[in-house]
Amino acid sequence: MSPNSTLWQTILQDLEKLYNEETYNELFLPVTSTFKDQNGLLTMVVANEFLKNRINKLYIAKINELATKYSSTPVRLKFVSQEEVIEEPVADRKLTIDYRQGNLNSTYTFDSFVVGKSNMFAFRMAMKVADQPGAVANPFYIFGDVGLGKTHLMQAIGNYILDNDVEKRILYVKADNFIEDFVSLLSRNKNKTEEFNAKYKDIDVILVDDIQIMANASKTQMEFFKLFDYLYLNNKQIVITSDKPASQLTNIMPRLTTRFEAGLSVDIQIPELEHRISILKRKTATLDANLEVSEDILTFIASQFAANIREMEGALIRLISYAQTFNLEITMNVVEEALGAVLKTKKKTNDLNENNYDKIQSIVADYFQVSLPDLIGKKRHAKFTLPRHIAMYLIKLKYNIPYKTIGSLFNDRDHSTVLSACEKVERDMRMDSNLKFAVDSIVKKIDSPLLK
């Protein structure tokens, strides 16, 4: 064990005594590596921005106090996320993967995943996959919008498998990191392809996050296609996440999307209010806050962040940190002080503003990758009629203006055409989960404060 690791292990022993089990397990244990520069700065690598920010905001002073206590030389600690780590030049490093740890965040478990109606099916199938890797659903494809728990559920599969079979070789990799590994190796030495393949193939379970990022990376897609087929034919478990159903992936080669669809696809939907409140209660219990957050406050926060659980949890952490810093009881006034800049009170207006209609049309066109003139125009190919009908439906849903007025926004279509389109979308959503997911995703984009 290196001196840096020894120092961190010593600090960990004190942290375990100072903080509760949840805080210790969630924040301090997941540190994956350490390295020290010539100026005595010891950089600690954690899995993501969330962990980095919490430690640096709330605990860094105590950690550096302990470092000074136990180090024989001047030293201070800094926490960074995995994405910030500057790697050694590719030519100087070996392509190695720690399969025992699998790049997994140990806090992402089935026990810490809050289950509700919106994710129940995905959760139960994930448990079956983890219990019988390679046998139940392969590939296992999880889709849903940003911040709804796809990564948590995917890594819970990996952690469960490792807990029950330490010999299993597991790898969690984000699609962009897979691309970077492949491109950087080839840019230095084209003969490294075999080494790349050998390392990625020597696993039992692969967890690939955000597969949609591979869009347009044709060479990487081809390499991933070869890897996919090899693992699949050898009964290795493949788990994939994406922000949309496989059938709606764009600029991904069809031979890949058809393989994704051949397994089991499950979606995680936007959780209902009661579910979001349960998530906040669980999060509050893990924060070691010693502060009471009332049901009314939790309900308010949950109502403001319907579409992104990470943002919702971030708001709760900000609120509790603010109250702790100023030694305040958490009231609605404190909520407004702490979260005012985050919330920016979104006032929804029903003004008949043509720009709002344009925005819906543009977002729908962008989502389905068709041009705005084709969306509004008279082309009858399904590629254009489906997004056109959805745009009509959403304008009616958001503004409840007359069908004739909506028709005027789509090349002067008549009342009955728009009425029929809206009824068809509403009817089809009840039977087609992929369509419902697409509409829900577009609604989220329309409501995003970044697009207002």
Swiss-Prot record:
Family annotation (SUPFAM superfamilies): P-loop containing nucleoside triphosphate hydrolases (SSF52540), TrpR-like (SSF48295)
Region (Domain II): 73-102
GO terms of molecular function: ATP binding; ATP hydrolysis activity; DNA replication origin binding; lipid binding
Residues that, per the record, bind ATP: 147, 149-151
Region ranges (Domain IV, binds dsDNA): 324-452
UniProt xrefs under InterPro entries: AAA+_ATPase, Chromosome_initiator_DnaA, Chromosome_initiator_DnaA-like, Chromosome_initiator_DnaA_CS, DnaA_C, DnaA_dom, DnaA_N_dom, DnaA_N_sf
Descriptive protein name: Chromosomal replication initiator protein DnaA
Protein's cellular compartments: Cytoplasm
The protein's role, per its UniProt record: Plays an essential role in the initiation and regulation of chromosomal replication. ATP-DnaA binds to the origin of replication (oriC) to initiate formation of the DNA replication initiation complex once per cell cycle. Binds the DnaA box (a 9 base pair repeat at the origin) and separates the double-stranded (ds)DNA. Forms a right-handed helical filament on oriC DNA; dsDNA binds to the exterior of the filament while single-stranded (ss)DNA is stabiized in the filament's interior.
Gene Ontology terms: cellular component: cytoplasm; plasma membrane
Major localization listed first in the record, in broad terms: cytoplasm
Tree of life domain: Bacteria
Any Gene Ontology biological process: DNA replication initiation
Region (Domain III, AAA+ region): 103-323
Alphabetically ordered keywords of this record: ATP-binding, Cytoplasm, DNA replication, DNA-binding, Lipid-binding, Nucleotide-binding
Similarity comment: family membership: Belongs to the DnaA family.
Record note on domains: Domain I is involved in oligomerization and binding regulators, domain II is flexibile and of varying length in different bacteria, domain III forms the AAA+ region, while domain IV binds dsDNA.
Subunit annotation: Oligomerizes as a right-handed, spiral filament on DNA at oriC.
Gene giving rise to this polypeptide: dnaA
Keyword Nucleotide-binding included in the entry's annotation: yes
Domain I, interacts with DnaA modulators, as annotated region: 1-73
UniProt entry tagged with the keyword RNA-binding: no
